[in-house]
């Protein structure tokens, strides 16, 4: 995850 973006848990 990056800051606020989590495409794949």
Swiss-Prot record:
Disulfide bonds join 1-6. The keyword Disulfide bond applies. Keywords: Amidation, Disulfide bond, Hormone, Secreted. Its main location: secreted. GO terms for cellular component: extracellular region. GO terms for molecular function: neurohypophyseal hormone activity. The keyword Disulfide bond applies. The modification Glycine amide is found at residue 9. InterPro entries: Neurohypophysial_hormone_CS. It comes from the Eukaryota. It is found in: Secreted. Belongs to the vasopressin/oxytocin family. Displays oxytocic activity on rat uterus. This is Phasvatocin. The lineage of its organism: Eukaryota, Metazoa, Chordata, Craniata, Vertebrata.
């Amino acid at each position: 995850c990056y800051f606020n973006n989590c495409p794949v848990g």
